[in-house]
Amino acid sequence: MKFVGAHVSAAGGVDQAVLRAHEIKATAFALFTKNQRQWKAAPLSTESIDKFKKNCEIYGYGPAQILPHDSYLINLGHPEEEALEKSRAAFLDEMQRCEQLGIELLNFHPGSHLKKIDVDKCLQRIAESINITLDKTQNVTAVIENTAGQGTNLGYRFEHLAAIIDGVEDKSRVGVCIDTCHTFAAGYDLRTVEDCEKTFAEFDNIVGFQYLKAMHLNDAKSELASRVDRHHSLGQGNIGKVPFTYIMQDIRFDGIPLILETINPDIWPEEIAWLKSQQTQ
């Protein structure tokens, strides 16, 4: 079964995200459990946690259908100790929020070396950050998102993801989220069925499909191998609709959140309906 949705707003409380997902007929959703552009946030109230769980129960969203995203400020591979510790503390808080809400996945961008340490050292730091956080939490899987490779961001090569996973001690609690826009911008083509076969075979060979825990379904304004992260609505960018049909018809993508982060929320209901329709083509 395919779980399809979008990254919805949690304005007014995390429980409201569930209602917004239901309104667009989503069978999965992503959200921020706190303000993504601030370091500090008030703890989740018991009332907010209870409302979130109740709404998920009412509208039929289980843990496999929910993909929270952490703060954009966090850099788990930061080259400077003080900033690294700040990021690690914030990441732990994000993981603990997921624990409180009964969510089993936390999606995050791996980190950036900022031209101050080498790639391998940065990847090692990211793995260490994950290990520290997993030791202090239970039941939540750290889901590494591949990146477009803008600036000094790592995670744009499948080898980066594999290296991080290799350094994580508890392999049962680490996984990957593949963003189609990022994948394309990083140089992995997806425009034809043959491209999809090749790219996902490479992913399986280097990382392994057993680690695929989620996907972000986005077309791209950016060009192939541009290392520029610019999302577009499905079928309106440089990728086209082929890979989205491919994903919807391939059982390897069953049972995980497939999340839109496309640029026009007004057409999310149509995009979700179209994706669902592709399963039976």
Swiss-Prot record:
Q: Which SUPFAM superfamilies match?
A: Xylose isomerase-like (SSF51658)
Q: What is its EC number?
A: 3.1.21.2
Residues that hold Zn(2+) 1 according to the record: H69, H109, E145
What's a single GO MF annotation on this record?
DNA-(apurinic or apyrimidinic site) endonuclease activity
Q: Which reaction does it catalyse?
A: Endonucleolytic cleavage to 5'-phosphooligonucleotide end-products
Alphabetical list of PROSITE patterns matching this protein: AP_NUCLEASE_F2_1, AP_NUCLEASE_F2_2, AP_NUCLEASE_F2_3, AP_NUCLEASE_F2_4
Which cofactors are required for activity?
A: Zn(2+)
The UniProt keywords, alphabetically, are: DNA damage, DNA repair, Endonuclease, Hydrolase, Metal-binding, Nuclease, Zinc
Q: Pfam family example for this protein?
A: AP_endonuc_2
Q: Which CDD domains match?
A: AP2Ec
Q: A GO term (biological process) for this protein?
A: base-excision repair
Q: Which SMART domains match?
A: AP2Ec
Gene3D superfamilies per the record? Divalent-metal-dependent TIM barrel enzymes (3.20.20.150)
Q: What class of enzyme is it?
A: hydrolase
Q: Tell me which residues bind Zn(2+) 3.
A: H182, D229, H231
Which residues are listed for Zn(2+) 2 binding in this entry? E145, D179, H216, E261
Which family, according to UniProt? Belongs to the AP endonuclease 2 family.
What the protein does comes down to: Endonuclease IV plays a role in DNA repair. It cleaves phosphodiester bonds at apurinic or apyrimidinic (AP) sites, generating a 3'-hydroxyl group and a 5'-terminal sugar phosphate.
Name listed for the protein in its UniProt record: Probable endonuclease 4
Species name? Proteus mirabilis (strain HI4320)
The gene for this chain is: nfo
